[in-house]
Swiss-Prot record:
GO molecular function: tRNA (guanine(37)-N1)-methyltransferase activity
Methyltransferase found in the keyword field: yes
UniProt-recorded name of the protein: tRNA (guanine-N(1)-)-methyltransferase
Gene that encodes the chain: trmD
Enzyme Commission identifier(s): 2.1.1.228
InterPro entries membership: Alpha/beta_knot_MTases, tRNA_m1G_MeTrfase_C_sf, tRNA_m1G_MeTrfase_TrmD, tRNA_m1G_MTases_N, tRNA_MeTrfase_TRMD/TRM10
BP-aspect Gene Ontology terms: tRNA N1-guanine methylation
Length: 228
């Protein structure tokens, strides 16, 4: 899979590509990351890419032309604008994007984009209801979430029991040695060796954690915790 990232700050992505799972995926040939500085496509003096807002307003807006020209350089990709106004990114969307051979993520900066940029992308995505200085961190977040789903990047089945996978609930609590730490004990059922009981406990714990931390997830579901 190829992921293009349009950014005014390509240096942000250097360490990101050189560490952990992303570096391994690139080395094995499962993933290609192509960072494009869309300032290089500016026709303005001094490669200017922003200007004042029509109708008045604070800050500067990114101009449509350099972004459009940069997008034209990756014609076969599925193009995504990163902005707070977009649909909120989630695991379901990560699976959808992982089906594409090539995607392009457009990172904003300053006060945002000229609205006409939307005419040259396929979709607009947000990573949450908060404001960041630029789209670089959201681009890394989406890149990692999508890359993990590309065949060959992770061991088969290694992501299937994580939060938001399978039944869509949060992951169940997990423990390792020691069995007791400062009086805090690992649940006895996990030490029992009874896999049927362990499986049931994990389903109950997953549901309880989701009920406590993410009621919004349960609001979207109709089934009970032990149905299926």
């Amino acid at each position: 899979m190829k992921i293009n990232i349009l950014s005014l700050f390509p240096e942000y992505f250097k360490a990101f590509q050189e560490n952990s799972m992303i570096a391994k995926a690139i080395k094995l040939g499962h993933l290609e990351i192509n960072v494009i500085n869309f300032r290089d496509f500016s026709k303005e003096k001094h490669q200017k890419v922003d200007d004042t807002v029509y109708g008045g307003g604070d800050g500067m807006l990114l101009q449509v032309e350099p972004i459009d020209l940069a997008l034209e350089s990756v014609p076969n990709s599925y193009k995504i604008l990163l902005s707070p106004q977009g649909q909120v990114f989630n695991q379901t969307k990560a699976h959808e994007l992982a089906k594409h051979q090539e995607i392009t993520l457009v990172c904003g900066h300053y006060e945002g984009f000229d609205e006409r940029v939307l005419e040259f992308v396929d979709e607009e995505l947000s990573v949450g209801d908060f404001i960041l200085t630029g789209g670089e961190i959201p681009a890394m977040l989406i890149t990692e979430a999508v890359a993990r789903l590309v065949p060959g990047v992770l061991k088969k089945g290694s992501h299937e029991n994580e939060s938001f996978e399978g039944d869509g609930l949060l992951d169940y609590p997990q423990y390792t040695k020691p069995a007791i730490y400062k009086g805090l004990k690992v649940p006895e059922v996990l030490l029992s060796g009874n896999h049927a009981l362990i499986d049931r406990w994990r389903k109950e714990a997953s549901y309880s954690k989701t009920l406590k931390n993410r009621k919004d997830i349960l609001a979207k579901r109709k089934e009970k915790p032990h149905e299926n």
